[in-house]
Amino acid sequence: MKALVAATALGPALLLLLPAASRADERKKGPKVTAKVFFDLRVGEEDAGRVVIGLFGKTVPKTVENFVALATGEKGFGFKGSKFHRVIKDFMIQGGDFTRGDGTGGKSIYGDRFPDENFKLKHYGPGWVSMANAGKDTNGSQFFITTVKTAWLDGKHVVFGKVLEGMDVVRKVENTKTDSRDKPLKDVTIADCGTIEVEKPFAIAKE
């Protein structure tokens, strides 16, 4: 009888713990990946490998639509053949300037620039993909991939994706030699790019 009472007493306690644990899991659970884009990178004349990026179309639909269209080239312009023009170790790698190639160009599918969609997501750690800009509401086509947590960029740059595969390729680019302006000495080129089907949206952790 005593054992039964003890088990009964434990029951409510366990039940009370479950909602709290669920809330903790919800907080840890990040945005849902609704689309994927791949970049096949080349450093100099050597193939460096493939980077697969998950995109959060429910959180930042307009930003994701722009990125996907630039990856497929469906509007007649986009990322294919463009370069990562700025690389800073222990910070990020930046690309997407397919008009000038030096960080001063690029354009969106909506026109030259488009507004910041929202800042719901943060730069939680390595591998998060965010829009480069020249200040408020100046998004075009340039983006960067973090190689460390960059909390100081939160609320200033729109995060819209995360590297799902090929972070080793990102690291390879991060460690390439650069000049005094952070430009790689060997061209880091997006040799090919496009989309990968996502059958069902899935959430990833904020890490």
UniProtKB/Swiss-Prot annotation:
InterPro entries: Cyclophilin-like_dom_sf, Cyclophilin-type_PPIase, Cyclophilin-type_PPIase_CS, Cyclophilin-type_PPIase_dom. Residues 1-24 form the signal peptide. It catalyses: [protein]-peptidylproline (omega=180) = [protein]-peptidylproline (omega=0). One of its GO terms (molecular function) is peptidyl-prolyl cis-trans isomerase activity. A motif (Prevents secretion from ER) lies at residues 198-207. GO terms for biological process: chaperone-mediated protein folding; negative regulation of collagen fibril organization; protein folding. Keywords: Endoplasmic reticulum, Isomerase, Rotamase, Signal. It is found in: Endoplasmic reticulum lumen; Melanosome. GO terms for cellular component: cytoplasm; endoplasmic reticulum lumen; intracellular membrane-bounded organelle; melanosome; protein-containing complex. Gene3D superfamilies: Cyclophilin-like. Residues 38-195 form the PPIase cyclophilin-type domain. Its EC number is 5.2.1.8. Belongs to the cyclophilin-type PPIase family. PPIase B subfamily. This is Peptidyl-prolyl cis-trans isomerase B. It comes from Gallus gallus. The lineage of its organism: Eukaryota, Metazoa, Chordata, Craniata, Vertebrata. The gene is PPIB.
